[in-house]
Amino acid sequence: MGIMTIDGRKVEFTDEKNVLTVIRKAGINIPTLCYHSEVSTFGACRLCTVEDDRGRTFASCSEEPRDGMVIYTNSGRIKKYRKLIVELLLAAHCRDCTTCVKSGECVLQELAHRLGVHNIRFENTREIHEIDTSSPALVRDPNKCILCGDCVRACEELQGIGALGFAFRGTEAMVMPAFNKKLAETNCVNCGQCRVFCPTGAISIKTHMDEAWEAIADPEVRVVAQIAPAVRVAVGDHYGMTKGRSVMGKIVNALHRMGFDEVYDTSFSADLTVMEETAEFLKRIEKGEHLPLLTSCCPAWVKFITDQYKDYIPNLSTCRSPQGMLSAVIKEYFRDPENAKGKKTIMVSVMPCTAKKAEAIRPNSFTKGEQDTDIVITTTELIRMIDNFGIDFATLDPEACDMPFGFGSGGGVIFGVTGGVTEAVLRRLTKNHTKEAMREISECGIRGEDGIKEVTVPYNGMDVKICVASGLANARIVMDWVKNGEKEYHLIEVMACRRGCIMGGGQPTRAGDRTKAARAKGLYNADNTMIIKKSDENPLVLELYDGLLKGREHELLHNDFY
């Protein structure tokens, strides 16, 4: 423990890793463009520069706190310095702020307002670079890049992919894929974490809102939406509501008002996933083949395996993702003339995930050669559509989802958080339906924010070894353990994004630690209020197995990755 003096106030510190953290602990929101606590310190933007009592200036993000330090965060010299930095950044930056997708959420734009940068004294030095729209999920605009390196570090350190890097030097420096390839030509898995970390509009979501509006406007089309579990705990943040609060009912109301004919809950098909994946898992355990079973809900993880661990493709569950299952079932349901009523069905999926856009157009996710999910919009796009329509979201009354695919169990709802798939499978395996049994499963070690969690649970006289990983860098560690024979598991669950879908690449950005924890808590709270906890107790799921799915489970609910 030590004591620093910050702007004349004594501030204690303990294990804070840098001066910046201590300053923020003291209640001073010092500006940064390149600092994120989850990745390595880069120290490139210099906006967090402070001054000490000897007149020395330094970047507070890369300086360790020392007992007795005297720091000034807003001296006249420092204020001029920060303002100059922003001016220089803007001199080489695209200034089409009114039409930029990041407008209103851009950190650079916010800092320009905050620091009083109303004029730029320097000549515009920027070069015009080609915008990369090759990816099915993301758009890369080098004209808006400020070389903060956030995307590079997120891709390399959190995801272990390294699709982006720095090229050239000095004033010619740029962030780009190796050899200036298009993003779609790289090993990018479409997870969108680069977009989450990007403070400007240099990396953004490839939007499909116009396609959704076009479908809604067509009187010959029935527009059906499905809403993923993680979406419901992220939308409310944008409208000033309690962080992590589930606003599913309001989302349903908003979609109905915008013109969606039917609105269903993806937690319903998460229950289908639990049913199918559990059956597949038990079959593999019995035969002792293709273990460990690798979950296949996350398309970024699936692409990671199919690209980089090809020998383990047979280990992937053949189950479609919940998005894929529900889209296939809904399309089949409306093929019945009695249900179709002469209209073509367009399936719109509302997801927290940018990689779902890539999954939707993946040929092996089609049914009989036809695309099941026609349009994927992210949570961020949904918010823009709600705002575009002029809906006062906070005042909406909640509405229930439509039937027969509008209800999921608690096990389906928690799919949105890391460990949720495993917990739902364990609920399915247990014959004990009591609250105590559900609580015991939740406390076995599969919950929490740790990037890698290992648990062993007894089942039918054997110890089932399970690993839960979130973040592809952690997934790589786990797969290398397995590949090298260092560890053995029966089941491995992976979500590409840290903490799971609640922090997906399509979610609203700039979520602090409190927001991250609140989103997970929001899904667990939703689970707590549900009467049905187990997927195999969902009456709508059981009815579907006795009806439309009878004898067609493999056709509609499974695929292969070869």
Q: What residues fall within each predicted segment?
A:
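Extreme N-terminal starter segment of soluble prokaryotic enzymes
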Residues: 2-3
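Short strand-turn-strand beta-turns centered on an Asx-Gly dipeptide
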Residues: 6-9, 52-54
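Fe-S ferredoxin-like electron-transfer domains
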Residues: 46-190, 196, 203-222
